[in-house]
């Protein structure tokens, strides 16, 4: 009798559990209603509410693969890339729509600043289903995300016949643009939107033009095809357009000191016009005070005008005019106008050469600034990317000084980009410096100076978009002054900042014992604090 009671109680308990599960589970009609509500919210571009409807379904059935796929798409549209990554990874575990899941996971990883991982899943999707056009296009894009332009070109040549005319145009446009050949890239984009005025192609072309500072052309393209876009889609582009035209103003404060107890305090304010102009002006004014170990002090007031010139896609320039009123302690004040002119030719984003002329009043110490020694220099600057990740940078100049000295400078750098987002770059630098009169001791003027170093750069993902950013450069090597023994040399630069849509602030610290880094030849510490407002 007791056993029968126990059996009955167990059956009743089991029946109660089944009824509770059935009460919690959604029937087909309830599930479909939530899907329809999600679709309606999606049509209204209210992706957050759409995701909530799907989460209600998944709370009852976490393994509903179709709903997980739908939610992942909505998370991409809502720019919730980390959550989208988790959704697509869950789909792969459920063995559901593996090609689509890997394609979308690849894109989500790229948008979440993991291009190398994105390439892995893009390659898997293409390897498993090479006949899928979306997998083909996504794998090509992933190669470009990782700057593997040579591999991308080779891959495109093998699959070109399987693509539609529109796909061939857009992939060629992306390839040329990423490879630095912006002339052919823009030409392909132009042909694309003329022949196939799809809103995604138009938006991509317009954003590429913004990146090339062809702002008027970008705006014209979007206005010509504005009927293709919803109000919110066009508003998102308009926000990017406004950002390029923002003017800015700010203040900067500098503290510099070296081991010889030379100290410079400087504060300045500036105003700069927005981009999209053929001539973009920046005006600044400030004061500085330089104090030496023996308490010699020289103060200065200055005004500065910078003009960035655009003569076309390939030609650009920058003009600087600097007016100073300098007051040495115990002496009469004097004024001086100096400046800088740069002309730059860049027919390809991976190849640039420029000519530079500049003049300056040497201000390394209080006594030197008060002596009104001026320098006039003519030089070059060049930057060549040998591939998507390896490049050469070099600059050099020859100058004459009003104290009858002459200066010759060379700097060369070979670097390799290890990864992007965050950016990690390593390389080798070499520099040489020669003065014709090493007997002058008012500043560092060796007959022969050589320096070589290994360096590494790091910057957080997309520092121009992120709210918080951090950039670090460190280098170590050796230097030789005259014929003396080689000595250790190091360099460190770090910057921490915060950006919002209208405000920016940042603190930068630099230190180095590289003798040519400062005019005195001494180790120094240099702090710069900046505040900026954009509107």
Model-derived regions: residue spans:
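Bacterial Sec-dependent N-terminal signal peptides
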Residues: 1-29
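Amphipathic alpha-helical repeat elements characteristic of tetratricopeptide repeat
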Residues: 28-32, 36, 48, 66, ...
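Short, conserved structural micro-motifs that define repeat-unit consensus positions
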Residues: 37, 70-73, 88, 143, ...
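Short, compositionally biased segments
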Residues: 43, 77, 82, 111-113, ...
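Mid-chain, structured segments of secreted extracytoplasmic proteins
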Residues: 65-104
């Amino acid at each position: 009798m007791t056993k029968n009671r126990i059996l009955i109680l167990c059956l009743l308990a089991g029946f109660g559990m089944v009824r509770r599960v059935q009460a919690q589970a959604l029937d087909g009609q309830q599930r479909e209603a939530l899907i329809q509500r999600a679709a309606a919210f999606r049509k209204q571009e209210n992706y957050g509410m759409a995701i909530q409807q799907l989460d209600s379904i998944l709370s009852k059935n976490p393994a509903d693969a179709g709903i997980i796929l739908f939610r992942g798409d909505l998370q991409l549209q809502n720019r919730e890339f980390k959550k989208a990554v988790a959704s697509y990874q869950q789909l792969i575990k459920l063995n559901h729509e593996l090609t689509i899941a890997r394609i979308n996971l690849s894109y989500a990883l790229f948008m979440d600043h993991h291009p190398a991982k994105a390439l892995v899943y893009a390659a898997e999707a293409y390897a498993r289903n090479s006949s899928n056009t979306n997998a083909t296009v996504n794998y090509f894009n992933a190669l470009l995300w990782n700057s593997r332009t040579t591999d991308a070109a080779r891959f495109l040549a093998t699959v070109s016949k399987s693509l539609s005319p529109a796909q061939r145009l857009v992939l060629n446009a992306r390839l040329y643009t990423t490879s630095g050949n912006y002339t052919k890239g823009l030409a392909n984009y132009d042909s694309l939107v003329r022949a196939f005025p799809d809103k995604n192609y138009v938006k991509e072309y317009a954003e590429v033009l913004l990146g090339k500072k062809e702002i008027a052309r970008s705006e014209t393209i979007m206005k010509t095809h504005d009927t293709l876009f919803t109000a919110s889609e066009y508003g998102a582009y308009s926000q990017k357009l406004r950002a390029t035209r923002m003017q800015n103003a700010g203040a900067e404060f500098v503290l510099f000191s070296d081991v010889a107890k030379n100290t410079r305090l400087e504060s300045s304010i500036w105003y700069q016009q927005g981009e999209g102009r053929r001539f973009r002006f920046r005006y600044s004014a400030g004061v500085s005070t330089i104090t030496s170990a023996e308490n010699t002090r020289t103060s200065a007031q200055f005004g500065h005008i910078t003009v960035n010139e655009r003569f076309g896609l390939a030609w650009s320039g920058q003009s600087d005019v600097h007016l100073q009123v300098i007051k040495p302690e115990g002496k009469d004040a004097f004024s001086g106008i100096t400046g800088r002119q740069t002309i730059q030719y860049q027919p390809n984003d991976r190849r640039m050469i420029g000519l530079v002329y500049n003049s300056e009043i040497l201000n390394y110490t209080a006594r030197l600034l008060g002596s009104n020694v001026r320098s006039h220099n003519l030089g070059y600057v060049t930057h060549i990317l040998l591939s998507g990740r390896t490049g050469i940078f070099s600059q050099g100049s020859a100058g004459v000084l009003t104290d009858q000295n002459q200066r010759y400078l060379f700097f060369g750098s070979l670097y390799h980009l290890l990864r992007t987002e965050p950016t990690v770059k390593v390389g080798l630098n070499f520099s040489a410096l020669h003065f014709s009169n090493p007997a002058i001791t008012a500043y560092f003027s060796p007959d022969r100076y050589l320096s070589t170093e290994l360096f590494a750069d790091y910057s957080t993902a997309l520092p121009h978009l992120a709210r918080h950013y951090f950039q670090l450069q460190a280098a170590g090597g050796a230097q030789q002054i005259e014929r003396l023994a080689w000595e250790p040399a190091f360099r460190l630069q770090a910057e921490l900042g915060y950006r919002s849509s209208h405000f920016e602030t940042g603190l930068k610290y630099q230190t180095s014992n590289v003798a040519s880094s400062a005019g005195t030849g001494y180790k120094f510490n240099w702090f710069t604090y900046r505040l900026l407002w954009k509107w």
